[in-house]
Amino acid sequence: IVSQINGVANEYKVNFYTSQLTKDGKQSKLYDSYSKLPEMVGRKVEIDGEIRENRYYSTNLNQLISTQLLAGKFVKGVVETAIDTATFVVGGFLVKTPVERRNKKDEVYRYDVTLGQSNYAGNGMSMITLHINPDHAEIVRAVEGMYGVGDTIQFTGSLVFKTEVVTVE
């Protein structure tokens, strides 16, 4: 998905997945909807979805790898004059207090806030890490002042989804 928000070009990779058949063996309405996605290329759309964790074990690195992705659920066409926006609402329990990230010049370039989410069965958990721009450090101070580890919290904000590769030297 490509959009212009506040004069800045943004590109979002959104994954769509569903089974072709329901548990009852009937054709899935979501599958029917997703099969029409190629017809929407080049058109303005509205997507509802979720930020999801993808966790897997890397035998090459001999460690657990966690990535976040945007998972689309519902998509519909909108008028071409609609203003581009990208917002999110995400909630969960605070896994750890906000972490300050610094670059090689020892400048703060972001704060990380990690939320945990349990599945409905209660036998699995996902972790979502939100990055807060240092220009909005008041958000971090509010989290530190009002919430403790394990408390339920909800964030609403503007979505900037970047792929980042971290190399440990």
Residue map of PLM features:
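OB-fold and OB-like single-stranded nucleic-acid-recognition modules
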Residues: I1-E169
